[in-house]
């Protein structure tokens, strides 16, 4: 014996009551009602289950965001800060894949120098045109400031590091490199020699 279930469905302009019997399904009554009337509709159990499943499919079609899996939030990559015995702190921004620099090597690099508060001091890369004038340094404490040498040793060509260099291993005299050739930038750099300086270094080549 077929089972019938009664549900309430809204219709616009009219309502219909459908009944299911043992041998036939027929429309038993049609009546005109108001615009927002609700009628009881007798629906066979099998039809009800089919309609229910169809409705869930429509829900997913109408709202695809409900069907799509929720993407997992990625944790931001944490850049570690390493501290050397001299007090130099640095971060590995990009790990290079080229030749590794050792003490005594001649290297070519670009750099940006800033004060610890972020104010610009000097750079080998033009801020407007993007053109660069790389410098060549010998990784020796008699040629380059000690703190920068410590940061460069162990770097690989193509790598980039950001370092905070304390004045004790910075420009302890005016002959140490890197130092701008122009008078204005050189004076600006040396005027901040007694404070920590931030260097962002890109190692281009190990010669």
Curated annotation (Swiss-Prot):
It is an enzyme of class 5 (isomerase). This is Peptidyl-prolyl cis-trans isomerase FKBP16-1, chloroplastic. One of its GO terms (cellular component) is chloroplast. Residues 104-207 form the PPIase FKBP-type domain. The keyword Chloroplast applies. The keyword Iron does not apply. Keywords: Chloroplast, Isomerase, Plastid, Rotamase, Thylakoid, Transit peptide. It comes from Arabidopsis thaliana (Mouse-ear cress). Its EC number is 5.2.1.8.
């Amino acid at each position: 014996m077929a089972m019938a279930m009664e549900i309430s469905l809204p219709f616009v302009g009219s309502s219909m009551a459908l009944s299911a019997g043992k041998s036939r399904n027929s429309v038993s009554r049609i009546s005109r009602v108001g615009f927002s009337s609700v009628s009881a509709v007798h629906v066979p159990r099998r039809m009800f289950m089919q309609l229910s499943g169809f409705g869930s499919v429509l829900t997913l079609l109408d709202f695809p965001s409900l069907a799509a899996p929720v993407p997992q939030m990625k944790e931001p990559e944490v850049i570690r800060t390493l501290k050397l015995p001299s007090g130099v702190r640095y971060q590995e921004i990009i790990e290079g894949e080229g030749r590794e620099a050792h003490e005594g090597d001649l290297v070519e690099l670009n750099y940006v120098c800033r004060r610890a508060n972020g104010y610009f001091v000097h750079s080998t890369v033009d801020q407007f045109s993007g053109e660069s004038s790389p410098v060549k340094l010998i990784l020796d404490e008699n040629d380059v400031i000690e703190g920068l040498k410590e940061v460069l040793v162990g770097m690989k060509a193509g790598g980039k590091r950001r370092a905070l260099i304390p004045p004790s291993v910075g420009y302890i005299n005016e002959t140490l490199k890197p130092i701008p050739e122009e008078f204005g930038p050189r004076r600006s750099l040396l005027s901040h020699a007694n404070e920590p300086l931030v260097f962002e270094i890109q190692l281009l080549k190990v010669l």
